[in-house]
From Swiss-Prot:
Homotrimer. Interacts via its C-terminal region with NHERF4. Interacts with the lectin chaperone VIP36. GO terms for molecular function: ATP binding; GTP binding; guanylate cyclase activity; protein kinase activity; toxic substance binding. It is an enzyme of class 4 (lyase). Guanylyl cyclase that catalyzes synthesis of cyclic GMP (cGMP) from GTP. It is found in: Cell membrane; Endoplasmic reticulum membrane. It comes from Mus musculus. GO terms for biological process: intracellular signal transduction; regulation of cell population proliferation; response to toxic substance. The gene is Gucy2c. This is Guanylyl cyclase C. Keywords: Cell membrane, cGMP biosynthesis, Endoplasmic reticulum, Glycoprotein, GTP-binding, Lyase, Membrane, Nucleotide-binding, Receptor, Signal, Transmembrane, Transmembrane helix. Residues 20-433 are extracellular.
Amino acid sequence: MTSLLGLAVRLLLFQPALMVFWASQVRQNCRNGSYEISVLMMDNSAYKEPMQNLREAVEEGLDIVRKRLREADLNVTVNATFIYSDGLIHKSGDCRSSTCEGLDLLREITRDHKMGCALMGPSCTYSTFQMYLDTELNYPMISAGSYGLSCDYKETLTRILPPARKLMYFLVDFWKVNNASFKPFSWNSSYVYKNGSEPEDCFWYLNALEAGVSYFSEVLNFKDVLRRSEQFQEILTGHNRKSNVIVMCGTPESFYDVKGDLQVAEDTVVILVDLFSNHYFEENTTAPEYMDNVLVLTLPSEQSTSNTSVAERFSSGRSDFSLAYLEGTLLFGHMLQTFLENGENVTGPKFARAFRNLTFQGFAGPVTLDDSGDIDNIMSLLYVSLDTRKYKVLMKYDTHKNKTIPVAENPNFIWKNHKLPNDVPGLGPQILMIAVFTLTGILVVLLLIALLVLRKYRRDHALRQKKWSHIPSENIFPLETNETNHISLKIDDDRRRDTIQRVRQCKYDKKKVILKDLKHSDGNFSEKQKIDLNKLLQSDYYNLTKFYGTVKLDTRIFGVVEYCERGSLREVLNDTISYPDGTFMDWEFKISVLNDIAKGMSYLHSSKIEVHGRLKSTNCVVDSRMVVKITDFGCNSILPPKKDLWTAPEHLRQATISQKGDVYSFAIIAQEIILRKETFYTLSCRDHNEKIFRVENSYGKPFRPDLFLETADEKELEVYLLVKSCWEEDPEKRPDFKKIESTLAKIFGLFHDQKNESYMDTLIRRLQLYSRNLEHLVEERTQLYKAERDRADHLNFMLLPRLVVKSLKEKGIVEPELYEEVTIYFSDIVGFTTICKYSTPMEVVDMLNDIYKSFDQIVDHHDVYKVETIGDAYVVASGLPMRNGNRHAVDISKMALDILSFIGTFELEHLPGLPVWIRIGVHSGPCAAGVVGIKMPRYCLFGDTVNTASRMESTGLPLRIHMSSSTITILKRTDCQFLYEVRGETYLKGRGTETTYWLTGMKDQEYNLPSPPTVENQQRLQTEFSDMIVSALQKRQASGKKSRRPTRVASYKKGFLEYMQLNNSDHDSTYF
């Protein structure tokens, strides 16, 4: 475990260096007329070729490259740098342990500045795949090996030896042949012998055939892997086998080692893959008798030894592996010459991706690379001629054209009648002939009876097909309010808003149903539509929603369909709260969901409906038992399908539907389930319409969503490979839903380590996890609710008195109350209207905000309640809503003194030097209070005391606290010694003449009160206030201060600014 952790740390630390070393190293070793190729010399037992031979092959290739460059008048230097693995820490013993070795060699290249224009090697699949997985290889890599499927379709990888994919395509094509003179039957079964000790090429060839979701496995009805020689011998000689065909990889000697001296059954065919042996074509080669039942797949001799010099140079201890290194060097020289002649840059990404879809002159003749950078060959299938005991060509396979070409007309091999046997034991031409004659006789007898029965059946069936259930509208009932909720833990339900607009939930026959709009107004369906509705009515399966019939409501026709409480699968995937990844949406559940969809589609394809046509995640719904059901099927004649992200490319080009198109839609849904992201999620494209366009108009590599195969483990990789096979561009390569269903069952067994756990056991275990997660979720939501409640209470307490808020929460109403004695405070700003005339709206708002914020801080230090602000008026009361004895007059008086002290030090920001004067009026008396209104409720005061307090303020003087005699009387009853002066008789509108007072301070406390203006100052202010404001504005401009410019609104027009101010005729204190 420690070593694995260390390896992971090394890879993480090393990876950034690999991503950036290309830009610096290539400029040193691939420019200014000097070009190098870096050759990785990894010593392991998988390839028995001495490294010295490989080096000699590369150097010989460089000699040829230099010669060709000179002939092309290109005066450049071409060399090779050989990097050996002698000093590596993770030196491998064979290819299956060389994962770290390739990365270590890359690090050595980076450190020693040896990286050239291209990289030769490694040859091991594991090492090559790991390098592409952990690094960004922005340079061409040429490999003499890397046969595995995991190395397919790499943008910068070129393979000089045939990969496993090419072999697999040949076997599939050969199995399908049924029109050759020597092979009248197509094969659908096979055994694969793989014991794990094969050489590197055989290991990956057989691994591709063994894979459960490979192309070879998909086209076969039966395939089994034999891993022990005893199993191989039993199949080779026994009668209890399921196929006559066995595929293995190796040499004739390795076949004999496994077979021994056992007698092979006459109808057995062994396909021996031995691509790199040349002795089959030698003149002195005689086939042994144990090879009679063997067909050998190899590369023909002209591909590797047609050149006399090649035969001479590679006959002494060398192999096709050495030739591959030489050919790779020639390929590098060919591309270098091409780019230099065209004046193009050999260090850019174009050069890295140019090693494909071309033909160059190799050492043994022309060499062709396909559009994936893999070599194309002509493979030969050989048989043993009983006449000459020589190997002869039976068929040839062109990997470039993907075409099998029969060569032999009447091959004299061991099988009867010069024909290969059937792959199924016991079936052959003779047995088939007997079966045909027997069945013909029976059919003739039954045919006459069937014709009579068929005629009557067709007549009855035609009448029955046109009938369907039309439900009277009286049988459809709306749901109660408490029945419309769906199963979810999400607090908000906005995500279902659009769905509710499209579908209607009702009740039919005591069951919840959904009304699906059929876009039909009169209900006069055509004959074809009636037949489709009848098929819908007859469909009844566990993973399909039930169709009950049609109903006419108002002027529209609806389909009545079974309702599933948890909504669509797309909604479930979006709801990460109700269905978290750690419990419900784990891999087992995802596979169960895929299996439910596959079962439903498998039944649908085998039913009379035959095809869905609109399969997508929004048409897969989940019921209360977490069973996924398919809906919205069978109405293609009524609701034709539309183009969307789930539509197969062939149906985007032509508006049709097919079962293979449903398989493609299943793959898109599977990608949604696996990644739990948006539909057709891909990092390379986010636009919906562009995705559809790129799928419809695929050029080269088809456009598909992301799957992130790099992060998948072995079990998850099986699911990913299944998904990729389902969205193949060629519909014929996609599996059917029966195959998908069986593959998912095998994958589900892998996640349980082959344990026999039923679906109910899995569901119960998942519900237990879900219950524990729900407890934590409820606790978390409770904490969030309490925090939100406290915030709401705090806001309510800022708007209404605390007692009023509690009464509203507990009773829902607030009873109005009469208070015998309270004190009310009024104040306003002198000259407010004149200030507004010379100020912008934002300056007025800022001024009032600065003043009121300071007033509010003062109010918080006294037992008073701020009632409201009206323009420049500020209203405060004490003694309500909580009574406080005689303290109400004391608290209002102290607050008034504090406010007046603050005003003495306050200065307007936008009018520096301008004095701010306020008038304050205070009165005590009885008052009524209560909450008025429903929208924006306010705690309002009513009574003559409120009006009198307002009159006290309006008849007062600037920087003075004007108090009524009732307030002074209350103050005298307290222990507080306030200082006041008698103003004299003052006329109060509505009350007549009363004696009023000026509050000037307290004996035991100092207040920094501003000096009230004299009568002369007041008169001067009335006449010169506008001039003082203009002078303050000029002073602000001279000092360089800028006021904040307000954002103009639509209601602002040219002319003077206007301000809204609440004012009555009696309250004229803001005017002089």
